[in-house]
Amino acid sequence: YIVWIKDGKLLNTTDSDQVTASAISEIIENKQSSLQTVVQIDKTRPLLLSENYDTEKNTELQSYIFFSKGRIRALDYGTWFHRDKGKTYGRQFTNKSLMEIYSSIGYELFEQKGDVLSVKLMLNTIQPPENIDFNTNITNKETDAKLYSIDFIVPKNQSDSLYSKMLRFINENTPYTVSLEKRVTPCLVLKRTSGKDKLATKGGTMIDGFLKSPSVLQNATLAYMISALNANNNTTSLPIIDETGYKGKVDLRFSNVKDLKTLQKELAQYDLALEQTERPLLMLVIKDK
């Protein structure tokens, strides 16, 4: 935060983005200031709930919703959890793109169904897609206007339904609809080609270096490999599904995991195959209304 002082008097408090040549000239030349006052907001309490509420001793907040579009300068870009006794009964996102909010909510909803959400399982059909999915690190009026902030709190005994209710609320109050749908989708399936165990770890320190060169997994589960392959499209744009049924920890080494053909060839030494097929997969589908 920046404090503006002139002639020994406090003029304003702002964020650093407002420190520009034109803003400084306005102050020096005693012109009408375009500065927007920024006062730090406490994210640990319900977002923008008046402190007057704290003086009411005979009432207890049961639920709370705050939802806004456009950058809030007094808040950072991030997220916050409202928790009690290990249960999350509220979630806060500040200055995020809708895609970032959707993916975080989707991750929780997929986990509740025993699945793992990846970028390859998110289908953005919005036109143009940049309305909800853009680089939030670029700060300008256009991107600031597309940022959203939400604080969504449910009664503590309804914590299990937090994310489904949160998504429903966002669907009702934006021009878009997000749903979890099973769709038959092209994918790559990891399979074992024999009953011989060529995967079992010899022990030692757990190493997750799958995306490095050379690629190394030591004393780790296959889930590390699947997660890394699904994290981006560097190896393939297709989702990777594990159908090996192998639950133990493994030792694996590859020369170049960014080249699909090389990876498939080197998987064979462990009696593994990565084959293209189709499967009904749970997808996070985002549509215009």
Report each predicted region and the residues it spans.
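Beta-strand-rich assembly/attachment modules of structural machines
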Residues: N30-K289
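Non-catalytic, surface beta->alpha helical segment in thiol-disulfide oxidoreductase systems
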Residues: L10-K31
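A short, hydrophobic beta-strand/beta-hairpin element that forms part of a small beta-sheet core
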Residues: Y1-T13
